[in-house]
């Protein structure tokens, strides 16, 4: 038994090799009898993705103290491609919310799905700050808005005042410019050392949004809240974001009375379908331009 607790039930194993074929780091080998194993010293390379565990057709593999009998079975009861596309086409950014909490059952479903969001290299170390109570949200909302309003009136806190100067009068008038009256909020932060730090929070929130909207819950990607969190340290402390983590992005959510009657008609993106051709070296000028564009935010 290794540090990973990679265990093979020899009574069940059919020697199909699927666990080894699907191992992302290629550390699953076979002993002389054809049973899979992870050699001592290779445990450190395991991503703990559990693919070997999931793909075994007979449930012969346990890893990381996970037992196959404790997992749901994939029954292929998936939505059709038309149903998935319909969900994508009809999702909308919601800026008008009921002033009430989600029911506990719906909130629990949303919490439970978060762990299934993939992360780069299966880092799986995101921090999620969840406000699931409207009273807590209102306290956070008021603190944020009052801090920004004070900065705008004094013109002393330049990073904050510059970012929100355009909305100064709305803050003065008490408008909820940032949070749009949302009763709930999800803030995803990521370790600064994570291999795919920029995208991991976005992946999680993309999964969260589609699942939330399938439950009739409105969502909003909130760049203003992300800016506020990055400029006002008190807010990060309130959300218990650990040291060594940076705010990735923010999503607001809650029930809404808005009912959209049809899908929008967005313009197509510019898609370059690449045909077979030689790859020629870029000129010096083209290299400089590309380095410049890739380095921008």
Say what each PLM segment does.
Residues 1-297:
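Acidic, surface-exposed loops and disordered segments
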């Amino acid at each position: 038994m290794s540090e990973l607790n990679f265990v093979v039930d020899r009574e069940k194993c059919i020697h199909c090799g699927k666990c080894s074929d699907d191992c992302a780091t290629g550390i699953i080998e076979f002993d002389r009898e054809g049973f899979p194993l992870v050699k001592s010293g290779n445990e450190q390379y395991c991503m703990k993705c559990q693919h070997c565990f999931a793909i075994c057709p007979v449930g012969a593999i346990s890893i990381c103290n996970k037992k196959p009998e404790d997992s749901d079975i994939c029954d292929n009861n998936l939505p059709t491609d038309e149903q998935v596309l319909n969900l994508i086409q009809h999702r909308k950014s919601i800026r008008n919310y009921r002033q009430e909490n989600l029911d506990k059952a719906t909130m629990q479903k949303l919490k439970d799905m978060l762990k299934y969001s993939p992360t780069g290299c299966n880092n799986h170390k995101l921090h999620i700050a969840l406000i699931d109570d409207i009273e807590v949200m209102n306290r956070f909302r008021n603190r944020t808005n009052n801090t920004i309003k004070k900065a705008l009136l004094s013109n002393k806190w330049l990073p904050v005042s510059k970012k929100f100067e355009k909305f100064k009068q709305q803050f003065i008038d008490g408008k909820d410019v940032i949070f749009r009256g949302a009763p709930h909020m999800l803030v995803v932060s990521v370790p600064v050392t994570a291999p795919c730090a920029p995208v991991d929070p976005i992946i999680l929130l993309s999964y969260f949004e589609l699942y939330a909207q399938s439950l009739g819950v409105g969502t909003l990607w909130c760049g203003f809240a992300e800016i506020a969190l990055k400029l006002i340290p008190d807010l990060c402390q309130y959300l218990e974001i650990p040291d060594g983590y940076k705010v990735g992005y923010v999503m607001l959510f809650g029930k809404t009375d808005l009912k959209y009657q049809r899908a929008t008609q967005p313009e197509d993106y510019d898609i370059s379908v690449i045909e077979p051709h030689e790859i020629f070296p870029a000129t010096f000028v083209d290299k400089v331009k590309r380095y410049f564009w890739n380095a921008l935010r």
